[in-house]
Amino acid sequence: MTSRNYLLLTPGPLTTSRTVKEAMLFDSCTWDDDYNIGVVEQIRQQLTALATASEGYTSVLLQGSGSYAVEAVLGSALGPQDKVLIVSNGAYGARMVEMAGLMGIAHHAYDCGEVARPNVQAIDAILNADPTISHIAMVHSETTTGMLNPIDEVGALAHRYGKTYIVDAMSSFGGIPMDIAALHIDYLISSANKCIQGVPGFAFVIAREQKLAACKGRSRSLSLDLYAQWRCMEDNHGKWRFTSPTHTVLAFAQALKELAKEGGVAARHQRYQQNQRSLVAGMRALGFNTLLDDELHSPIITAFYSPEDPQYRFSEFYRRLKEQGFVIYPGKVSQSDCFRIGNIGEVYAADITALLTAIRTAMYWTK
């Protein structure tokens, strides 16, 4: 364990502000109105407002990582007669397929490959051919590659065919402007430690109330029962069914204040975009190539091909960067040797410049 802070160039957990960390120095009682009404309920209202100005939506917080909330939605939203079309082009779409299989949920997996954008015409054809499909689920920002998927076009299909639409916006909500009502999203899933720049400990679901109310008695799990969690928070003014991650919640409340102070989602999106563009330009100047074409990139994380030099080892490159105070991500693409660099969190233009200088220094195989 080290006492030194590194700049995390990852898609979350990410580098947080000092004030977000300091918010966790306070201890809260989970039965206290100051906490449940004063903090939890305020967070729920703010999340819903960030997602849409339209009526009929609500927010539910759930202990655990983002995957817990994805599993809660799949396990609660789909009844025994339902079937979900899962659009997959990375590890997180594949994880939804695995979850559906383990829970015995009928599903059709449309796997378009890790470096390909989902083909909307192909999705249209699947929906047209199989009227038993009741739900569509997909990832927005697929951090396996840095791909930004077309949730608007798929949402239009979901609306046209009358399907319930589930979007894993884990690494995009709070960092990319969106209106979930306009996108026809029924369940949006995200996490505390992503673009809102909190710390790990809980995830959240912003859902259409009418859809959520229909989930009663459907859950395949006790602790991941999304309907029961929602009703507990509604009926008890922010109370969690099981132990609330109080310190994480306080940090998140502070992170929401800092998002507003920055200028909201639009301003944060602009910063993330500039970070990503500067990173890509600088890396290309150093001789690195991106895995994806520019038009496919999200402003969240970028995958770069590993150097072909026989001396190159990611572990050594990583170590040399870490010695200089920067932490990057290994690759997760099955067919390509690459590594990834995120640019969200408390990361600014000067940090990207410093990172590029550190990368130049760490390129031992060029010496």
UniProtKB/Swiss-Prot annotation:
Enzyme nomenclature, EC number: 2.6.1.37
Keyword Ribosomal protein set for record: no
GO molecular function term, any single one: 2-aminoethylphosphonate-pyruvate transaminase activity
Alphabetic keyword roster: Aminotransferase, Pyridoxal phosphate, Pyruvate, Transferase
GO biological process terms held by the UniProt record: organic phosphonate catabolic process
Residues that bear N6-(pyridoxal phosphate)lysine: 194
Cofactor(s) for this UniProt protein: pyridoxal 5'-phosphate
InterPro entries: Aminotrans_V_dom, NH2EtPonate_pyrv_transaminase, PyrdxlP-dep_Trfase, PyrdxlP-dep_Trfase_major, PyrdxlP-dep_Trfase_small, SP_NH2Trfase/AEP_transaminase
Pfam families in the record: Aminotran_5
Reactions catalysed according to its record: (2-aminoethyl)phosphonate + pyruvate = phosphonoacetaldehyde + L-alanine
Its biological purpose: Involved in phosphonate degradation.
Family as reported in the entry's similarity comment: Belongs to the class-V pyridoxal-phosphate-dependent aminotransferase family. PhnW subfamily.
Record's subunit section: Homodimer.
Protein name as catalogued: 2-aminoethylphosphonate--pyruvate transaminase
Organism field: Salmonella typhi
Gene designation per UniProt: phnW
